UniProtKB/Swiss-Prot annotation:
GO cellular-component term (any): DNA-directed RNA polymerase complex
Gene that encodes the chain: rpoZ
Similarity-based family: Belongs to the RNA polymerase subunit omega family.
UniProt subunit comment: The RNAP catalytic core consists of 2 alpha, 1 beta, 1 beta' and 1 omega subunit. When a sigma factor is associated with the core the holoenzyme is formed, which can initiate transcription.
Gene Ontology molecular function terms on file: DNA binding; DNA-directed RNA polymerase activity
Domain of life (superkingdom): Bacteria
The UniProt record lists the keyword Transcription: yes
Catalysed reactions listed for this entry: RNA(n) + a ribonucleoside 5'-triphosphate = RNA(n+1) + diphosphate
Native species: Aeromonas hydrophila subsp. hydrophila (strain ATCC 7966 / DSM 30187 / BCRC 13018 / CCUG 14551 / JCM 1027 / KCTC 2358 / NCIMB 9240 / NCTC 8049)
UniProt entry tagged with the keyword Cell inner membrane: no
PANTHER family listed in its UniProt record: DNA-DIRECTED RNA POLYMERASE SUBUNIT OMEGA (PTHR34476:SF1)
Pfam families tied to this protein: RNA_pol_Rpb6
Role summary: Promotes RNA polymerase assembly. Latches the N- and C-terminal regions of the beta' subunit thereby facilitating its interaction with the beta and alpha subunits.
Taxonomic lineage: Bacteria, Pseudomonadati, Pseudomonadota, Gammaproteobacteria, Aeromonadales
InterPro entries listed in its UniProt record: DNA-dir_RNA_pol_omega, Pol_omega/Rpo6/RPB6, RPB6/omega-like_sf
Protein's recorded name: DNA-directed RNA polymerase subunit omega
Length: 91
């Protein structure tokens, strides 16, 4: 298991407080939402995986915001298509 130093991850994010927010958000994506890790899992917990991704510069707040917006647009498009299909069935 590779050690993650907070100092290296802080350099990527800017400060410790933002690091906590970004790491928690990414760890939730991996653990709860089933997102695929961008690094090898190596039997690490989601929080360690998130910190390793941040340390390598693979994940930051902007990347996650962009991904969330894209997924939101996909979800809205799917919902509109479902509503249109239901409306066609009634018409």
């Amino acid at each position: 298991m590779a050690r993650v130093t907070v100092e290296d991850a802080v350099k990527q994010v800017g400060n410790r407080f933002d690091l906590v927010l970004v790491a928690a958000r990414r760890a939730r994506q991996i653990a709860v939402q089933g997102k695929d890790p961008l690094v090898d899992e190596e039997n690490d917990k989601p929080t360690v995986i998130a910190l390793r991704e941040i340390e390598l510069g693979l994940v930051n707040n902007q990347v996650m915001d962009t991904q969330d917006r894209y997924e939101q647009q996909e979800q809205e498009a799917a919902e509109l298509a479902a509503v249109a299909a239901i409306a066609e069935g009634r018409g």
